[in-house]
C-alpha cells in the first residue's frame, strides 16, 4: 500500500480461495472537492489496464468522487491469469467479486462506468446488482458483430475444432476455444441477448457512442436505449472519436470531461450534462500517470521475486 499523503492511488489485493488475486486501486476525493454521494467503480475496456484510466480517476476525484478501479482475472494488468484464458464470464465474475469486496467494506452506493467490451459485461449484470447508476462509453452491444469488425472475420461461424488456437485482438492472443465456447454457452454473442439482459433496467443510465466508431453500430445502441425507460436513460455522442478513446489528447479530454459530467449528473439524479466541472491540471494527470506506472512495475517486480 502506498502513502496516501504523497500519492493518491492506494493498492489493494483481493485474495481468492482459488489462490488467484484481483488487484484493485482506490483513489479518494480531493481534499478541496465537494464529496459526492456515490463511489465510482471503473471497468476498463478489453486490453486496457486500470492504470490506463489514471486520467479519468483524476478527473472524477477532483470532482468529489471516491474512485475504484480493478484489473480482471485472465486479462492484461496486475490480476492473476493470462489473457489467452480470458472469457466474458471470467470478466463478469471479476466484476462481481470486486463489488462484493466493496460491500464488505460498507461501500454500498456506487455507480459503474464501463468501456467497450466491459460495457457488455455491465449490461449483463446491471439488473443483478444494486447499482445507483450506469455509464458506458463505446459500449459493445452486439459482441459477435464487434468481433467480426475488429478481427476482419466472423470466427464465431466456425466449428470449435476449426478455430485457430488464438485470436489476435488488439495485439493480444485471445484463446479462441475458451472465449468462443463461453460466448455461446452463456449467450454473450448477440444483440438480442444484450437487450434481454437490459429490458427491465430501472436505474439511471447514460450511454456514450463515438460518431467514428467502426466497431459498434450506433443504430443498435439507439435501439437498446429506446427499449428502456425514457425517463431514466439518455444517449450522447462523443463527436470526433473512434472506438479508441485514447487515440489523441483532444478525444481523450472529451471522454474525461463527458464521463465526469455524466457521473456528476447521475449522482444527483439528472441526465442533463450541462454541468460545470473542475478540470485537473495536465501536469497533475501526467504526474499521477507516471507514479501509477511506477507502482505497477514495483508490484510486478515483487511478484516475480
Swiss-Prot record:
GO biological process: bioluminescence; fatty acid metabolic process
Cited Gene3D superfamilies: alpha/beta hydrolase
Record InterPro entries: AB_hydrolase_fold, LuxD
Primary enzyme class: transferase
Domain of life: Bacteria
Active site: 116 (charge relay system), 213 (charge relay system), 243 (charge relay system)
Pfam families hit by this protein: Acyl_transf_2
Record key words, sorted: Acyltransferase, Luminescence, Transferase
EC number: 2.3.1.-
Keyword Iron: no
Record GO terms (molecular function): acyltransferase activity, transferring groups other than amino-acyl groups
HAMAP family: LuxD
Function description: Acyl transferase is part of the fatty acid reductase system required for aldehyde biosynthesis; it produces fatty acids for the luminescent reaction.
Similarity remark: Belongs to the LuxD family.
Name of the molecule in the record: Acyl transferase
Organism: Shewanella woodyi (strain ATCC 51908 / MS32)
